[in-house]
UniProtKB/Swiss-Prot annotation:
This is UPF0398 protein Spy49_1277c. Belongs to the UPF0398 family. It holds the Pfam family YpsA. SUPFAM superfamilies: MCP/YpsA-like (SSF102405). InterPro entries: YspA.
Length: 169
């Protein structure tokens, strides 16, 4: 079994507030190309954390690819309460993350800050690599995950950056 974590910018972090934004189709083209590359190299699990934005678009692409490739999808939420306060439109996206092959809630609810690092450590230990939409020119809290990932020997990182997207458009 080979599992790849998929994570990246949330839609608000890159100023995309409408699913019909033309940038979404460019991002999804890049996702499709990269996910096919993973599948053709033996990856059989895509792991998500259930966030809006990049993960949402990658989940849509992964579900489309299930028609062509034997792949499994998992969502490992940080908390059971993840997305509880989202609006109705976003609740529909949350239901898509819950309708995958495997769903796990790492913690019942928030209790202390160390839960975040424990969660990311778990994700790193259960996956062989990560596909991350991230650019050091536009930092977010993902920088902490990426630092841990880069410190792990043999952990494979594929970054989708703004430069790569510009090359594709």
């Amino acid at each position: 079994m080979t599992a790849i974590l998929i994570t990246g910018y949330r839609s608000f972090e890159i100023g995309i507030f409408d699913h019909k934004d033309p940038r979404v189709s460019i991002i999804k083209q890049a996702i499709r190309k990269d996910l096919i590359g993973y599948l053709e190299n033996g990856v059989d699990w895509f792991i998500f954390t259930g966030n809006l934005g990049f993960e949402q678009w990658a989940l849509e692409v992964a579900n489309e690819l299930k028609e062509e490739y034997p792949l499994q999808i998992a969502t490992i939420f940080l908390f059971e309460t993840h997305g509880d306060k989202w609006n109705e439109k976003n609740q529909e996206v949350l239901s898509q993350f819950r309708a995958v092959d495997f769903v796990k809630y790492y913690f019942p609810n928030y209790e202390q800050p160390t839960q975040f690092s424990q969660y990311y450590q778990f994700l790193l230990e259960k996956t062989e690599g990560a596909y991350v939409f991230y650019d050091t020119e536009n930092e977010t809290n993902l920088k902490y995950f990426l630092k841990k990932a880069k410190d792990m020997p043999h952990y494979q990182l594929l970054l989708l950056t703004f430069d790569r997207l510009n090359d594709m458009s």
